[in-house]
Amino acid sequence: MKKVILIFVTIVLSGLLYAKDNKSTDALLREIDGIIKNRQTYGAEKEARIADLKKLLAEATSDEQRYGFCGHLFDEYRAYNLDSSFVYAQRKEELAHRMDKLDYLDDAAMNMAEVMGTTGMYKEALELLGQIDKKTLPDYLYGYYYHLYRTIYGLMGDYAVTEKVKKEYYRMTDLYRDSLLQVNASDSLGHVLVMADKCIVHAQYDEAIRMLMEYYNKPSLDDHSKAMLTYTLSEGYRLKGDKQGQKHYLALSAIADLKSAVKEYVSLRKLASLVYDEGDIDRAYNYLKCSLEDATLCNARLRTLEISQVF
């Protein structure tokens, strides 16, 4: 009898954890199927925003305005077209030189380092970041600065061949993660994501899930925020050994990615592997095909390589 009650409680608690979206995982997969069929609609909305920004940039009357619009264009192209995002980071650098503004130069350099890191140019990204004098950085750039170091060292650790090198890169990742926690506002999305990441690294999966769910339940989150939160939730469930939780939150993350029209993402590819393992071959192929097409359009070479290896 006690065993039956325990199983019942476990099922109820699981339902509460997945209740925020009020959809079953199967319903989420069907939603993804529909979004993939019509994903050009979301791409058209993004292209319209980009066209408007380019028009504003062309009509700008000062370098300050041009710098701002180039920044917005960098943000729009981030995870959408990496070559274009790099072009606008370079334009920001040119304008910063012209205005002789050191903080603008540092911001542009970090934009370029971000793109380099995303495309696997880790050495070049670290060299560029190394040219920035941390002592002269304004407060508003510290979070971005530490975030880039943490992300790049984390990626280098993921792809390191030897255990010794992997351990060193992860040690550096830990250092910059702690630095990030010191500068991010405690109620910010960035702080919650980094803190949850730290909990996951230290096998405190339930605590990570708790804080992520608390933030996820906030109203008016944009798709990008939802994508990051739910992907991190999926990692917490994966490491707990809860495949259903992992699948559920990967599905939510994939939906948010597709709706925000980003092309450089991970969730849909990982979800494809899970549904493949369950024997849903056609759906897995469709998800991988979509992921490969988007990665190719984005010029996300690392993602293209990862997906090609699955094929």
Predicted feature locations:
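A "functional boundary" signal
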Residues: I5, G15-F311
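Classical Sec-dependent N-terminal signal peptides that target proteins to the secretory pathway
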Residues: V9-T10
